[in-house]
Design a protein with these regions (language model features):
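Long, ordered, helix-rich scaffold segments
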Residues: 2-11, 15-396
């Protein structure tokens, strides 16, 4: 491996094991057993070793490797290694044999069988993959969804895939959503918009926005999301609903004036008792121009909430069209200066400098004069105020 990069010194290193090599590693056995136990299958040298074993075994290779794969008495990692060898070195198992492997007691073997069906799609394998969506193991269900995405063998009935959206395994829910996005939208649009399970509805509507990001669709999703937020939702689901609104607003290029009811609803929620909610609420409020949160946002800046959360809120305030009075403008600028001076991150200090400069565009002439008089204390604000001075600058 190597180190260095980006103008730093580095080097090339090799790691060598100097301990005693276990007997099971030194003695891999002979014949097909050595091929099954061969370490580092993905390396070139390991594949060369296996290719040599295959040449030695000749016509017996296929039967011996298949025997390892299909025997329930073998450990699952031996069986899946045998399936890998059949894929890499042949003979590739027939569709019937792969379907038989998909019914094995071992979850690992069933998942590997689903992987192989994704590589070699056929009519029977498509039906079997749809059946395996109801497997009792999440790893198998994930492998099935990935195989469907790879091969295009999608289910025709959305009800086969929708329950997986609510699974606790986030990776499974993700790949299931990707499968749903590939299916014809007209088959599942109404189901996700009206689904009783909020989790299925949230992820289903995210799939809908990705599959059909039209303005009409995004407005429907925003309307349904607004309804969901009036019902009981867990904190995690509420946060995801807010994020769904952000995606819908962005993908549909929705003008804030089209969703004034959502704007007012978001404004009423801020500040929430959960910091994750506040992160999403302040972003939405800034985009939707929810000026009614201005006073509460200023109170939030002076609260005892974590500084990163307050800084995010302060950085979003610059996007509000609220007509700040002089006292409020100075309070916001004071926070920018304080956060920039207190942070140990040079990057954040530079971000806050840019935010101060942008916010300074709203300063009045009186504000500019007052800030420049205190330039030694309010350095970033003074720099922003300079941009407001008339050109050329006179001595006064």
């Amino acid at each position: 491996f190597c180190t260095g990069g980006r103008g730093t010194s580095g080097g090339v290193y090799r790691v060598v094991y100097k301990g005693e090599i276990p007997e099971r590693v030194k003695n891999l056995g002979s014949g097909v057993a050595a091929a099954i136990r061969q370490p580092q299958l993905e390396s070139a040298w390991a594949r060369q070793e296996i290719a040599s074993i295959r040449r030695q075994l000749g016509d017996q290779w296929g039967q011996l490797v298949a025997g390892v794969a299909f025997s329930n008495d073998n450990p699952s990692h031996y069986r899946t290694r045998a399936m890998d060898l059949m894929q890499l070195f042949g003979p590739v198992p027939s569709e019937d044999l792969v379907i038989e492997l998909s019914e094995a007691p071992s979850e690992t073997v069933r998942a590997k069988a689903a992987w192989m069906m994704g590589l070699h799609p056929d009519a029977k394998s498509r039906e079997r993959l749809i059946e395996m969506l109801r497997d009792r193991d999440a790893r198998v269900q994930r492998a099935v969804c990935e195989a469907m995405l790879r091969s295009g063998q999608l289910p025709s009935d959305p009800s086969d895939i929708l329950p997986l959206l609510a699974d606790e395994d986030r990776t499974l829910a993700f790949v299931a959503r990707r499968v749903l996005e590939r299916m014809p939208v007209d088959k599942w649009r109404k189901q996700v918009l009206g689904h009783l399970d909020s989790r299925v509805g949230i992820l289903g509507m995210l799939a809908l926005v990705n599959a059909d990001p039209s303005e009409e669709t995004c407005l429907e999703v925003l309307a349904r999301s607004s309804e969901l937020m009036t019902e009981f939702l867990s904190d995690a689901d509420f946060v995801d609903t807010l994020r769904l609104c952000q995606v819908a607003l962005h993908r549909g290029q929705i003008d804030p004036s089209r969703v004034t009811a959502l704007r007012d609803q978001i404004a009423e929620e801020f500040p929430a008792g959960d910091n994750r909610m506040n992160h999403e609420l302040i972003r939405l409020a800034a985009y939707l121009q929810a000026d009614s949160i201005a006073d509460r946002a200023l109170d939030y800046l002076s609260s005892d909430n974590p500084e990163p959360d307050r800084t995010l809120a302060a950085m979003c305030l610059q996007f509000l069209s609220h007509d700040w009075n002089a006292e409020q403008r100075f309070e916001i600028l004071k926070y920018y200066e304080s956060a920039a001076n207190n942070t140990s991150s040079s990057s954040l200090a530079m971000y806050l400098m840019n935010v101060t400069r942008d916010f300074g565009k709203s300063l009045s002439d009186e504000d500019v004069t007052a800030i420049l008089e205190q330039g030694a204390v309010w350095r970033n604000a003074a720099l922003a105020a300079i941009y407001k001075l008339p050109r050329p600058i006179d001595e006064e």
